[in-house]
Regions:
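Conserved beta-strand positions in the central sheet of alpha/beta enzyme cores
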Residues: 34-36, 65, 82, 102, ...
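Catalytic cores of alpha/beta
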Residues: 64-79, 90, 106-118, 146-178, ...
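Glycine-rich, proline-tolerant flexible connector loops at the mouths of alpha/beta enzymes
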Residues: 34-45, 126-132
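Active-site mouth loops of central-metabolism enzymes
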Residues: 1-21, 99-105, 154-155, 160
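Acidic (Asp/Glu)-rich catalytic clusters
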Residues: 22-31, 53-59, 74, 93-96, ...
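Histidine/lysine/aspartate-rich catalytic loop segments that bind and position anionic ligands
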Residues: 100, 104-130
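Alpha-helix-loop-beta-strand connector modules within alpha/beta enzyme cores
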Residues: 46-68, 85-107, 135-160
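Glycine-rich phosphate-binding active-site loops on the catalytic face of alpha/beta enzymes
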Residues: 5-11, 84-93, 121-136, 158-184
Length: 184
């Protein structure tokens, strides 16, 4: 099962040197196959995105993504972009630009649209209780989504314990995505 690391400014900081050190340590310790730089409010987003891509390049086989900004992902040489569910219509442009595309989804309808528009993978969330993310969908709903949709599905939301990962593995999901699971 694939591991997908999502950064958070609260846990990785917005200070370039600290960000780089924390990122490198976590990538070394957890060896995820996918990683996305996500910081919706940072005025230094481009500066830290550049550091993120450079550090990710040190880890062979790591698929490096930026959150929401396909143009910047292309400019900095990232492998892909993680789009929000509100950015569904941006999938074709991102794919045309040669990017690997993951879309955040919360419903079957969003997954169906993501597939139709050519997304490579989706996150489906929240699976477990997660701060400010609404009612958890649960592992049973994840199993249903995985069984009926021909796309890579990453479980997301509230994944903080090894037993969460074990439950997701049994669902047949392609992988799991998390912020807090990877932080000590």
């Amino acid at each position: 099962m694939k591991k997908y690391l999502i950064t958070s400014p609260e846990l990785y900081t917005q200070e370039p040197q600290s960000f780089e050190a924390i990122l490198r340590r976590i990538l070394t310790e957890h060896t995820p196959e996918y990683a996305v730089y996500r910081d919706k409010q940072n005025p230094k987003y481009k500066e830290l995105a550049k550091i993120f891509v450079q550090v990710c390049r040190e880890f062979a086989g790591l698929c490096c993504l930026l959150h929401s900004d396909a143009a910047l992902a292309c400019e900095l040489g990232a492998d892909g972009v993680h789009l929000t569910s509100a950015q569904l219509e941006a999938i074709p442009h991102a794919k045309h630009s040669g990017l690997f595309v993951i879309l955040s989804t919360h419903t079957d309808e969003e997954i169906t649209h993501a597939i139709a528009l050519g997304a490579d993978a989706v996150t489906f969330s929240p699976i477990f209780p997660s701060p400010n993310k609404g009612e958890p969908k649960g592992v049973e709903a994840l199993c249903e989504v995985v069984a009926k949709n021909p796309i890579k599905v990453f479980a997301l939301g509230g994944i903080v314990e090894p037993w969460h990962v074990e439950a997701i593995a049994k669902s047949g999901a392609y992988g799991f995505a998390s912020i807090r699971f990877f932080v000590d």
